[in-house]
Amino acid sequence: MADYLISGGTSYVPDDGLTAQQLFNCGDGLTYNDFLILPGYIDFTADQVDLTSALTKKITLKTPLVSSPMDTVTEAGMAIAMALTGGIGFIHHNCTPEFQANEVRKVKKYEQGFITDPVVLSPKDRVRDVFEAKARHGFCGIPITDTGRMGSRLVGIISSRDIDFLKEEEHDRFLEEIMTKREDLVVAPAGITLKEANEILQRSKKGKLPIVNENDELVAIIARTDLKKNRDYPLASKDAKKQLLCGAAIGTHEDDKYRLDLLALAGVDVVVLDSSQGNSIFQINMIKYMKEKYPNLQVIGGNVVTAAQAKNLIDAGVDALRVGMGCGSICITQEVLACGRPQATAVYKVSEYARRFGVPVIADGGIQNVGHIAKALALGASTVMMGSLLAATTEAPGEYFFSDGIRLKKYRGMGSLDAMDKHLSSQNRYFSEADKIKVAQGVSGAVQDKGSIHKFVPYLIAGIQHSCQDIGAKSLTQVRAMMYSGELKFEKRTSSAQVEGGVHSLHSYEKRLF
């Protein structure tokens, strides 16, 4: 036993593992499966880990999760769910500009503090107009003013309780006959704070609280449903007006300037320039145009995988970079064009360069599980963009179908011929709009049902927090600081180590993640 003893106590600890710099300066292209993070010291619980992350220079999220602008991943339903759970969704642009802008508008109107542009009707409108508004907007608590517009005298409100039991032949009745009159309403004065208004709404037990000025003219309204959403989703991503954050994608062509104008009018918070290879004169010119016309709009450039690519977009003025080329589950760019880079190496190299200029990095692609998210964040990414991981959730576009008894949803790459045939925007992303023969850079497939975002994303959040706990970091900021200082250590995995790290040596098993 004495042969194993070393004098001098336990003060000596051998150097173990590789720093990120040592790991990625070996010349090999590494994916997330090619390495592990070595554990640290735990003196806190997982729920104490702060996942606050920068999406762009000016937008911060409470969770580092972003949904990809793909037509089988993100429309309004996904963007709303992502924002409510602390992330953000980017509405795809493989559609008309009008459709995309309307999807953004749905997100911005979903949860609000002071609603300054609500649906308003007049006393001479009819009951059928309320039902039409309910079908179009999903609610029927509608204020009634003299002229049917904001800024005119409030005379009443119409709610579901006023119309629920009306027969169809009564749908031509004027609203003034059945509305709740002004004298029966609880209102609040203009200038009141949101907190004070919410307290009045809670005490009144009403569904809506109109805000009026000294002339009794309607200037805003607050909804009880928004109070409930605030309670149920404390991490929700919101702007200064308490509206949900929403992003959208555009291309780099001249006609995308019209799309940009519609998105700006709809209230979009951040725009990503959607290109498979972002280091182009087209993207640089578009960045400069956007920054000049909409200086307060945050712009994400990409995709890039090298520091040289990143430099040109940073010089042009981007507020964040999207990193990844050919690493997505439905992407075949590396196979077809022989261009791209393994994702772990790309994220580390670009993040290490971009951080010097205060430009956050979004790791886009190659994410197969929550461990990959943790690794991307540990390599310098501020947020992680997900496509296949969120496809087939309830909130993703498309209908479920069954194959061999398994519930599936369609999922396709924006470089697939299927997506290119749907709309020109997908062709533009891959510089294929003028080609007589299309070269597919993606495939179409199907993904198994994952349930709702409202259950799946909390699982991802908990997984990231537990990963940070094992690392010994109380925040993602600390994780990155440990990585750049060399305190955080990594280790390469052989193919045998990867087998050992997965489920093995069982006759059968059930893998339930949450």
From Swiss-Prot:
Keywords: Acetylation, CBS domain, Cytoplasm, GMP biosynthesis, Isopeptide bond, Metal-binding, NAD, Nucleus, Oxidoreductase, Phosphoprotein, Potassium, Purine biosynthesis, Repeat, Ubl conjugation. Its main location: cytoplasm. It catalyses: IMP + NAD(+) + H2O = XMP + NADH + H(+). InterPro entries: Aldolase_TIM (IPR013785), CBS_dom (IPR000644), IMP_DH (IPR005990), IMP_DH/GMP_Rdtase_CS (IPR015875), IMP_DH_GMPRt (IPR001093). The modification Phosphotyrosine is found at Y400. Mycophenolate binds at S276, G326, T333. Homotetramer. Interacts with CLOCK; in a circadian manner. Interacts with ANKRD9; leading to its ubiquitination and degradation by the proteasome. This is Inosine-5'-monophosphate dehydrogenase 2.
